[in-house]
């Protein structure tokens, strides 16, 4: 029962409780329950492989709700391009999307970086009340940094 992985998860649960971070608490609790109920490796692999896409889908649904309810319309879209903040937001959205795409690919080819990214994200969630949306984008930033290092060499 108290394997290294379970102790690691319990540590993250404790950190989530200390930081009062419900997202981290729920995520760790779900993973602990999956382990306690002996969910097989294939199911865990599927969740690991598809979980980010599921999360992105849920976030996208939440973002689209104001459009569906009429809170945001075409006028708002047009008005957003009349300000510097609107253009900066557009550029930031494009940049983050590209970084996330590169990050997913980089995490697949360099699993070593994944451990550091996950730990860094957990630390940011606990210490700075960050949001755990960072690993994919962080991997994209790491990818770009590694490309720069390779270019300089």
Swiss-Prot record:
One GO cellular component term noted in the UniProt record for this chain: plasma membrane
Membrane topology, from the record: Multi-pass membrane protein
Keyword terms, alphabetized: Cell membrane, Membrane, Transmembrane, Transmembrane helix
Superkingdom: Bacteria
Cross-referenced InterPro entries: UPF0756_TM (IPR007382)
Ranges that cross the membrane: 6-26, 54-74, 80-100, 117-137
Protein localization: Cell membrane
Pfam families attached to this UniProt entry: DUF441 (PF04284)
Family per record: Belongs to the UPF0756 family.
Name of the molecule in the record: UPF0756 membrane protein LMHCC_1001
Taxonomic lineage from the root: Bacteria, Bacillati, Bacillota, Bacilli, Bacillales
